[in-house]
Amino acid sequence: MESSAKLTSVRLSPRKTRLVVDLVRGKVIQEALNTLRFLPQPSAKLVSKLLQSAVANAEQKGVSDVDALYVKTIYVDGGSVLKRFLPRAMGRASKIRKPTSHISVTLSDSK
């Protein structure tokens, strides 16, 4: 049985978040959570919370053995970009892009 969870409009760069997500793809859920626990990246904490949410969704669906779950698919899509301007010298302005991410995960209990 599969369960999924989504996290939308997270104020993290999709490029940096993909580095963390690639480390847990295909792993058993407990191993993935242990991997994320020791990563220094800010996105690791959010991905960990998302995995725990997907596990809770699986329990709600009636999965009996939660320890047998593994990360079937996990991916990061780019969200909307917040655009800001920074005043510069001589009346000019520089554009500042603040990217957002959408993270989706699917857990499954059968390989």
Swiss-Prot record:
GO CC terms, sorted: cytosolic large ribosomal subunit
InterPro entries membership: Ribosomal_uL22 (IPR001063), Ribosomal_uL22_bac/chlpt-type (IPR005727), Ribosomal_uL22_bac/org-type (IPR047867), Ribosomal_uL22_CS (IPR018260), Ribosomal_uL22_sf (IPR036394)
SS bonds (residue pairs): none
PROSITE patterns: RIBOSOMAL_L22 (PS00464)
Gene Ontology terms, MF aspect: rRNA binding; structural constituent of ribosome
Pfam families in the cross-refs: Ribosomal_L22
Statement: the UniProt record of this protein carries the keyword Ribosomal protein: yes
Superkingdom assignment: Bacteria
GO terms for biological process, alphabetical: translation
Swiss-Prot/TrEMBL keywords: Ribonucleoprotein, Ribosomal protein, RNA-binding, rRNA-binding
Subunit comment: Part of the 50S ribosomal subunit.
Family: Belongs to the universal ribosomal protein uL22 family.
Functional description taken from the UniProt entry: This protein binds specifically to 23S rRNA; its binding is stimulated by other ribosomal proteins, e.g. L4, L17, and L20. It is important during the early stages of 50S assembly. It makes multiple contacts with different domains of the 23S rRNA in the assembled 50S subunit and ribosome. The globular domain of the protein is located near the polypeptide exit tunnel on the outside of the subunit, while an extended beta-hairpin is found that lines the wall of the exit tunnel in the center of the 70S ribosome.
Protein name from the UniProt record: Large ribosomal subunit protein uL22
Gene: rplV
